[in-house]
């Protein structure tokens, strides 16, 4: 198992817990809730995320699980994909039981805790796209209609259900980017990339002009003209300076910065830890992404490689959109920062996907060890043979 990836995950989870300990009570009191609401909730989310990561890490570990998966993989993935699509459609209808709507958007289910099915759709899209690429590569139909039709149908469903019905542009972009990067790495031609890019642009404009698009247009307008949210995010970075104001001294968390514990946690880290703290965090993400892509390069099986690349794209998209939105480089999308932000659904699902990468790194490192051992054996045998010839 890649120890560096494990250490980075532990560090990020610990930093997120520390930040929640520092600002959670202030945010809770500002909202009229008990001061330990968010800290206790985040501890519970981390516990569930660790379990999810362990499940992902041992998913294919046992021989019986591997054989069952190989035999029924296609049926399981298709059922999971279409079942998750149906669940997200259900979530989009406000009149149905358990559906939870906030600020005019129906994205959550109230099942004793708030759960966001679009996060589960990321896992479904990850497995579905990896299977589609691997299956079509094996059959020699990759890049043909047998590949493009189901892929574009899947992408269209994501745009309509998550982007239009649930009004969640952030998760829509993450899923489409993930599916696109997996297809690109698998061997898309430049012509196919151009066509796919054109379709994405057309779809984005259509999404902005479909139905109740006011809040999406406002996000784009605020990007060029400034906004309360964006301005206060920059103020948070300025307040932190080079070394930060320290734990417990955040001003932005007292109500000046919206969604301080989730969608705006990077400016809070910049305020508490300063420029150096924020840069250390970004360096940590760069190392994590590098180790993930290094794992993907060692995978011989196309489907396994696509799974790892998909997780790479998932984390990369979240980091770019969260950080880029907070520093004013791109429009805000309301996305979390992986392993740090408050949010049980997001944390659990990305932890499960990360666990899959850890599991795949076990096999690649085991293969590397076997290769090194056999190589040393061959070299030792050569030296011994030479010595015997000389004697």
Where are these regions (language model features)?
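Hydrophobic alpha-helical transmembrane segments
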Residues: 44-48, 122, 272-289
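Alpha-helical transmembrane segments of multi-pass membrane proteins
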Residues: 12, 84-91, 130-131, 158, ...
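Membrane-helix boundary/helix-loop-helix interface segments in multi-pass membrane proteins
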Residues: 1-7, 18-21, 26-166, 323-338, ...
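Hydrophobic, glycine- and aromatic-enriched re-entrant/interface helices and adjoining loop segments
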Residues: 102-108, 194-281, 299-307
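Loop-to-helix entry and N-terminal half of a specific, functionally important transmembrane alpha helix
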Residues: 297-334, 340
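Alpha-helical transmembrane segments of multi-pass membrane proteins, especially transporters
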Residues: 37, 146, 150, 175, ...
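Interfacial segments of multi-pass membrane proteins
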Residues: 173-192, 253-277, 334-351
């Amino acid at each position: 198992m890649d120890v560096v990836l494990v250490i980075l995950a532990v560090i990020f989870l610990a930093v997120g817990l520390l930040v929640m300990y520092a600002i959670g009570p202030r945010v809770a009191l500002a909202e009229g809730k008990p001061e330990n609401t968010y800290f206790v909730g985040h501890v519970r989310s981390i516990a569930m995320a660790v379990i999810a990561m362990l499940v992902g890490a041992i998913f294919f570990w046992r021989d019986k699980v591997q054989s069952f998966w190989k035999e029924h993989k296609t049926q399981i993935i298709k059922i999971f994909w279409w079942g998750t699509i149906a669940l997200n459609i259900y979530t989009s209808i406000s009149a149905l039981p358990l559906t939870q709507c906030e600020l005019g958007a129906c994205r959550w289910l109230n099942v004793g805790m708030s759960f966001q099915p679009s996060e589960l759709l990321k896992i479904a899209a990850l497995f579905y796209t990896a299977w589609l690429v691997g299956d079509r590569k094996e059959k020699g139909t990759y890049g043909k209609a047998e590949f493009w039709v189901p892929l574009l149908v899947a992408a269209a469903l994501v745009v309509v259900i998550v982007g239009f019905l649930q009004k969640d542009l952030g998760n829509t972009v993450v899923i489409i980017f993930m599916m696109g990067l997996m297809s690109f790495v698998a061997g898309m031609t430049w012509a196919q990339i151009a066509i796919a890019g054109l379709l994405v642009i057309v779809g984005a404009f259509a999404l902005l002009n479909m139905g109740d698009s006011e809040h999406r247009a406002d996000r784009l307008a605020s990007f060029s003209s400034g906004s309360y949210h964006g301005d206060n995010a920059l103020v948070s970075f300025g307040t932190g300076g080079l070394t930060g104001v320290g734990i417990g001294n955040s001003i932005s968390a007292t109500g000046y910065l919206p969604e301080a514990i989730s969608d705006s946690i990077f400016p809070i880290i910049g305020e508490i830890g300063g420029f150096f703290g924020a840069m250390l965090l970004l360096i940590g993400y760069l190392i994590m992404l590098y180790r993930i892509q290094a794992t993907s390069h060692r995978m011989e099986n196309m489907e396994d490689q696509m799974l790892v690349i998909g997780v790479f794209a998932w984390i990369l998209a979240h980091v770019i959109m969260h950080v880029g939105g907070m520093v004013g480089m791109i429009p805000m999308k309301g996305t979390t920062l992986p392993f740090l932000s408050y949010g049980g659904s997001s944390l659990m699902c990305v932890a499960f996907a990360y666990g899959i990468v850890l599991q795949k790194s076990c096999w690649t490192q085991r293969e590397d060890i076997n290769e090194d051992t056999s190589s040393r054996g061959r070299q030792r045998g050569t030296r011994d043979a030479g010595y015997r010839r000389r004697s």
